Amino acid sequence: GGMGAMGFALPAAIGATLGTGKRSIVIVGDGGFQMNIQELEVIKRRNLPIKVFIFNNASLGMVRLQQEQYNEENYVGTVKDYSAPNFKEIAAAYGIKSYEVSGMQAITDRIIESLENDESEVIDIRLTESKNQLEPRLAIDRPMEDMLPPMARDELEKLMLIKPIDV
């Protein structure tokens, strides 16, 4: 993670679509999607060509990863005491086409079919793997440009406009 604050994806896609007039694709976790789920109303009312792909791992995955790495797997509010609504039904209530898929072939087929049109759609991708690895990701004690897994230092220096911070 670390590419935007949790909940940022859906409103950012709305802004990008309104600004460019082009289709946007949202890739979001189930927790981040819940933070601005009401924006489905804007997508429907303005008939915006936005595809929402929810990577649904039934937990707050990025927060859970932090709990694994830094809090001795003390899962508070991420696995224990966490739930998510039926996203397919919520999208349908807003009048937006919605799908729930699982399994690699079904996921692949749905993505291909969804990208062939410009209709608004919500695709709830049900993840079954309990592992929670996100790459690249931020480390607590590193600057934003120095994500994990680490990039070769000389390569990082070539890409940076300023000298990278050494910690």
Q: What residues fall within each predicted segment?
A:
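Thiamine diphosphate
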Residues: G1-V167
